[in-house]
């Protein structure tokens, strides 16, 4: 496995918002949902020099991420430090050893990054089986990811930008 540089805790990342993720002007937790077989949630690093161009280019070519007839786009800003501090508990308030990490993913654009949810070194992927010791705690991958989604929603600062 190739070791990548860590993103500094002082950075912010931005999740580009699909218009379907807004209801009555409010961001919904669906904005932070992994699709089946996805290993990470796509975000962009705001500190990278190509950030604004990367995001505008993406939004311009994907109408569902445009607001007010293509005049604006929205992003949910997240502090990397806050994302890494997310904790997952199960019903009896037992803390699970789940790590939420933000890592560079320059596969699409220079500013692209991913938010990974892991148990040990295993990525938590929607609707997949959890490791055996987690299964004994009667917890599913979907329950873990749901907790993380709600936490991300609480941490997110919505920002509107001109296209």
Q: Which residues does each PLM region occupy?
A:
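Short aromatic-glycine-(Arg/Gly/Cys) micro-motifs in beta-strand/loop hairpins
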Residues: 20-34
């Amino acid at each position: 496995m190739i070791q990548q540089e860590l993103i500094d805790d002082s950075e912010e990342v931005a999740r580009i918002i699909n218009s379907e993720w807004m209801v009555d002007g409010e961001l919904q937790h669906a904005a932070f949902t992994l699709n089946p077989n996805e290993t990470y949630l796509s975000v962009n690093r705001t500190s990278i020099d190509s950030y604004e161009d990367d995001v505008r280019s993406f939004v311009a070519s994907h109408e569902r991420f445009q607001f007010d007839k293509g005049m604006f786009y929205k992003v949910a800003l997240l502090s990397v430090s806050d994302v890494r501090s997310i904790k997952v508990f199960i019903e009896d308030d037992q803390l699970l050893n789940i790590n939420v990490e933000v890592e560079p993913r320059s596969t699409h654009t220079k500013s692209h990054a991913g938010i990974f949810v892991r148990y040990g070194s295993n990525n938590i992927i929607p609707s997949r089986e959890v490791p055996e010791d987690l299964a004994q705690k009667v917890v599913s991958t979907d329950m873990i990811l749901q907790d993380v989604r709600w936490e991300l929603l609480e941490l997110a600062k919505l920002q509107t930008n001109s296209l």
